UniProtKB/Swiss-Prot annotation:
This is Transcription antitermination protein NusB. One of its GO terms (molecular function) is RNA binding. Involved in transcription antitermination. Required for transcription of ribosomal RNA (rRNA) genes. Binds specifically to the boxA antiterminator sequence of the ribosomal RNA (rrn) operons. It comes from Saccharophagus degradans (strain 2-40 / ATCC 43961 / DSM 17024). It comes from the Bacteria. GO terms for biological process: DNA-templated transcription termination; transcription antitermination. Belongs to the NusB family.
Length: 150
């Protein structure tokens, strides 16, 4: 069964919030995940994708941080607001582990999350960093899109 783009978008929305909560609270992932299932209507959410992003990001958080750190223009990780950090980690996870998702979709979804939940203008920061990460991690796909060979 094909999952709708809206269900996948809601999964990203909840995953970002859960990652933020995990980072801020230090609670176990399974506890946070259970709370999301209890406190939210998950009937229109791609629950498998939510689970994958939440646990996938947590499993390789340090590796994901290293993916985008070179593009932070002098900022340290602890200088980035926690919402932006969750968005960047989630997007980098999708870049690296979900190559079935076009890089432009990953960036667009991340920018939308930053607009909705992030600090003022954080979406511009997210867009700039992810454009550079995409060129490094998905170079062939980005270049094909830019030259019209997609």
């Amino acid at each position: 069964m094909k999952v709708s783009a809206a269900a996948r978008g809601r999964a990203r929305h909840f995953a970002m919030q859960a990652l933020y909560q995990w980072e801020m609270s230090g609670n176990a992932l399974h506890v946070i995940e259970a709370e999301f299932h209890t406190d939210n209507d998950m009937s229109k959410v791609d629950v498998e994708y939510f689970h994958e992003i939440l646990h996938g990001v947590a499993a390789i958080k340090s590796t994901l941080d290293e993916t985008f750190k070179p593009f932070l223009t002098g900022l340290r990780l602890d200088e980035i607001d926690p919402v932006s950090l969750a968005v960047l980690r989630q997007a980098c996870y999708e870049f690296e582990k979900r190559v079935d998702v076009p890089y432009k979709v990953v960036i667009n979804e991340a920018v939308n999350l930053a607009k909705k939940f992030g600090a003022a203008d954080s979406h511009k920061f997210i867009n700039g960093v992810l454009d550079k990460v995409a060129l490094r991690v998905r170079k062939d796909e980005v270049e094909a899109m830019r030259t019209g060979r997609s």
